[in-house]
Amino acid sequence: NNSEIVKEEQAAHDEWLRWRKEFLAEQELPTEYSQLSDSQKTSVKAIYEMIMYLQDKYGIEFEYTGYVRPQILEDEYLTAIPKGGNEKTDTVTVTRQDDGTLTDDYPNVVVRPFYEQMITDYIEDYFGSDQFKVYATVSSSTMQSIIDNSESIKVNDIGTSTVIFIDNDICSKHEINQLTNSCLLYTSPSPRDSTSS
């Protein structure tokens, strides 16, 4: 029905106008779109497109934290955090590929706390102590990692960099080396996981 299409288009346009005015005010830019340079207009449109991509894909609100226009040796990308998130641990990057498609790393952000908790539980069981802290950066994961949630996540489905701070009182250097080897075995795929069917 044409009237429904027109209503949807009007609603989308109204949302764009509302978002744009709010965004420009937050960035301390002129809220009158006509006062922006062509470059600023292009960037604002791209930022809106990327934020809406995230919100439509994941069904939650995201807050803008940064944007880089395409350059000779760098892809165009946006950084954002889930509303109320922590910029240090929850930053999501949306990248525009050469063919114009958008990709993101939100699954890595979602999986990180589950992964950190798995490693924390493992070390607590290993030493019988909670005198340590685990920090992880997840560089790759799958949507299946999110769908499966913390109950059934497979550590080897995730690419991470993990740092563990341990109180000197709970272990010796030798025990730390043993823990390192044990963690490597725990987080590495077993031979049966890597066989193809």
Where are these regions (language model features)?
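A short, surface-exposed beta-strand/turn
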Residues: K88-V111
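Surface-exposed beta-loop interaction hotspot
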Residues: D104-T160
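Exposed beta-strand-loop-beta-strand "reactive/processing" segments of non-cytosolic proteins
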Residues: D56-R96
